[in-house]
Design a protein with these regions (language model features):
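Intrinsic-disorder/low-complexity detector
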Residues: 1-180
């Protein structure tokens, strides 16, 4: 018998499934969370800086903070497709606007993606869904568990944003016949 998943791991799996189903239902994804090891590595590099910004702003602007994680995922996926060798070492500050985290969304949509029509509605919908999912968990604010759930929600939003952008760029998983 498999050991029971801890609460945070189960939350992450449930949130990922929820957002994947929601994004698939609205046509943003096709039932699969597209990813790349390079994009995942970029998240690991940017996560500490992003978490710092998001934690400071979450109480006042929770959905904005979650949306910015998705925008960051979209931007990383876009740059990965364009010329990853050129962009892979860019600092976190490259993704922030003139006012830092406060206009990160506009900076990414206007200056990197150059596509508000697709990215803004996608992230507004996903961030609202993710925030409501997080609030349904009823964790006590200020606790270690609430913080862990927040971190997981941000990470999942990054991955969903990256998957949406990869899908928009035409990437998809295909079954390959490896036989002779």
């Amino acid at each position: 018998m498999e050991p029971e998943k801890n609460t945070v791991e189960k939350y992450k799996d449930d949130l990922t499934t929820h957002l994947l189903e929601s994004c698939t239902g609205s046509g943003l994804l096709k039932g699969v969370l597209l990813s790349s090891p390079d994009i995942d590595d970029a998240w690991m590099r940017f996560a500490p800086s992003f978490y710092g910004d998001a934690v400071r702003n979450f109480n006042a602007y929770p959905e904005y903070c979650l949306a910015c994680a998705g925008y960051l995922g979209m931007a990383i996926a876009y740059l990965w497709d364009q010329d990853w060798a050129k962009y892979q070492d860019f600092p976190y500050s490259f993704f922030q606007g003139e006012r830092g985290f406060d206009d990160m969304d506009d900076h990414i949509t206007d200056n990197i993606l150059k596509d508000r029509r697709h990215s803004v509605p996608a992230m507004q919908s996903c961030s609202a869904n993710a925030y409501h999912f997080l609030m349904r968990e009823c964790t006590e604010p200020g606790t270690a568990e609430a913080y862990q759930f927040f971190l997981v929600t941000v990470e999942v939003m990054f991955k969903v944003g990256a998957a949406i952008e990869l899908g928009r760029l035409g990437y998809r998983y295909e079954k390959m016949n490896l036989g002779n």
